[in-house]
């Protein structure tokens, strides 16, 4: 999980979702998991 000030999709499998006001990226590649913080 990377915590970054700006999150971007890395590949086309990445999905941008919002959970409790936090922007997250989920992907089938675990290295692409990110959250905005």
UniProtKB/Swiss-Prot annotation:
Single Gene Ontology MF annotation: structural constituent of ribosome
Gene Ontology CC, one term: ribosome
Organism: Dechloromonas aromatica (strain RCB)
Alphabetized UniProt keyword annotations: Ribonucleoprotein, Ribosomal protein
Name this polypeptide is given: Large ribosomal subunit protein bL36
Pfam families, A to Z: Ribosomal_L36 (PF00444)
PANTHER family: 50S RIBOSOMAL PROTEIN L36, CHLOROPLASTIC (PTHR42888), LARGE RIBOSOMAL SUBUNIT PROTEIN BL36C (PTHR42888:SF1)
Entry's Gene Ontology BP terms: translation
UniProt similarity note: Belongs to the bacterial ribosomal protein bL36 family.
